[in-house]
Amino acid sequence: MKKIILSVAALAAITVTGQQKDSLQVKDVDEVVLTASRKKESIKEVPSSVTIVSQKQIQSQLTVNSDITNILQYTVPSLATSSGMTTNSGQTLRGRQVLVLIDGIPQSTPLRNGSRDIRSIDPSVIERIEVIKGATSIYGNGSDGGIINYITKKSNGEKTISGQSQVGITGQLYEGTLGVRASQFLTGKITPKFDYAVSLAYERTGYMKDADGVSLSPTSSPAKMDNYNGMLKLGYNLNGNQRIEASYIGYASKSDLNLGLKTGKYGMTPTIGEGSAKNQETTPQGTPRNHNFKLSYDNRNLWKGTALNINLYLQDFRTVYGYSDTFLNGGQSNVISKKKGARFNFDTQLWNTQNSQGEVIYGADILNDQTVQKLEDGRYWTPDMDMTNIAPFMLVKIDLFKKLILKGGLRYENIKVKVGDFNTLSTIKNDGTFTKSIFVKGGDLEYNALVGNIGFRYNFNPQINLFGSFSQSYSINELGRILRTSTAETINQLETKPIIVNNYELGATGQITKWLNYEITSYVSTSKLGATFVQSPDRSLMIQRAPEVVYGVEGFLQFTPARWINFGGSYSWMEGITSPKDDGDYSTKINNSRISAPKVLAYIQVRPIRGLSVGLDMLHAFGQNRFQPNAKTGSYTYGEGRVPEYTVFNFKSSYEINKSWRVAGGIENLLNRSYQPAIAWWAARDSDFVNALGTRGTLMVEYRF
């Protein structure tokens, strides 16, 4: 372990990388972060690496592709590349699963990871995205790789009504590819104390085709899909210190893609869409509902030196997958998750002197998560899982001489999961026969653990800010997957222990001159038990539970030599190793479904005349050749396929006609590069070997009032 930490530190010392202004994160010294400590604080007070994707960046990326998974792959180093489909399978953060939030409401379904949590909101309603990288327990279950928090737009201004209207079209140079999107945002104050914000968005996509004009695979395809998003926020200021706010955010997607599937050959011929489908699906693919309700109360002066924040929330999520003959008699599966939660957050000032100040943030989180995976015909694929999590926490923060920030915290996880009795599904084996269904007796599972974090940030001067931290996460990840493949007759015989991740991070950031910003970060994360998909001898997927180590580096450079131009980029690299027999031998690598290839993001943005902005983004994914194929068959197993490198350029531009009107346009895959996304290669399956989207254009018109 010491050798690993030293090697990562050495690599970080010689790695200088880049970060973009419109496509990547730019850290302003006064930038505010909400997610890191569950309160507003300057980014200069955070002892770890944070990526903030601003509203300006989101709007810029919208002119290229409105899929939030695509936006994030171009803006977040160490986040794996997008699949280009409705699933975010394989899109890990620093090699581990990420917890997705909308205004602090958990969207992820860690009890049975449906891989559709990142794509759970329309980007038009997002004000900013905060990405906390590395294991953390600050928001509870599921954040082994970090947190992605979508912070939605809020009421602003003193007008009774103001807003933003957008309409746009997308398409390729092929018949049937035309798509449309429209969004409307309204905000204002009805009275001096009562404010509101409301948003509606709709998008209809056309057919999606590769660089040769061939329809992409219909499996988990975003083509011919209706996407809906709505938001309503109502706020009332009781007085200068107290505020209550109620909000609803809803998202839904539904596909009517009637396209047949022509399965290709892995590494040779891509799987494509062709002809008409067999209409075996009884329910359209997509996410029929993602309802989020939240009621919050803020009191900035509950008593002397103490503030209080209370959040009560509900989430109702359902997503549906395509037809599969994996099951006996075939079928479509779904994931249903219903969450109820409360967060109680106190913030007490301990002291405040000229040279130091201290505060303690403390409270408790309560979460009930009911998750199940079934087939649309009613058969259970996982049992009903009912989790209750009660977690008190405390975080102490000390600021010395306005230069040194010290943080330390503890969180006690108390988790109980009720598992119902169930019969396992008969699924197809490699020889064409089906597994035998067995009855599994349910029961209660209970987990308890104390996890913590400690970190520092020393702001020497604008040129050098050092930070370092140790943090832990605690998660019950993929319990449903473990249960549904059970060969035991009772859950007590299964390996269902939680994952505790220890994350170590060391980095430096600063502004060398007024035109050059940088950041360098190295990290190591360890866990006694992981959860990785591996392929069994009959080619079915199973969860491997084994000790793991993931380590890597990332960094960025951002140049602004003149007011009319900026450029830069970022680089991220990681490696992961495991000990399958838990014997101290870490010569086995974690497969590519978790460990993504090194990634370079680069950009240039030019403003040649007033109101006009023109930019070019580049994503370069390096190749991966970490495993050898089977010596007899020449085939790779799942997650171990060789991944070739590829480079994609995107063009984007906008023109401010006046204070009210703006037009914008973008071209995705500018050079019409023919390539396959990483998942097509590392999955090593014929059905997953698909091409990526060819050149596609977007034109948008915006009106602000």
Q: How does the language model describe each region?
A:
Residues I105-K133, A182-Q184:
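Short acidic/polar hinge/loop motifs at secondary-structure boundaries
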Residues T69-T109:
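Extracytoplasmic beta-strand/coil segments of soluble accessory domains associated
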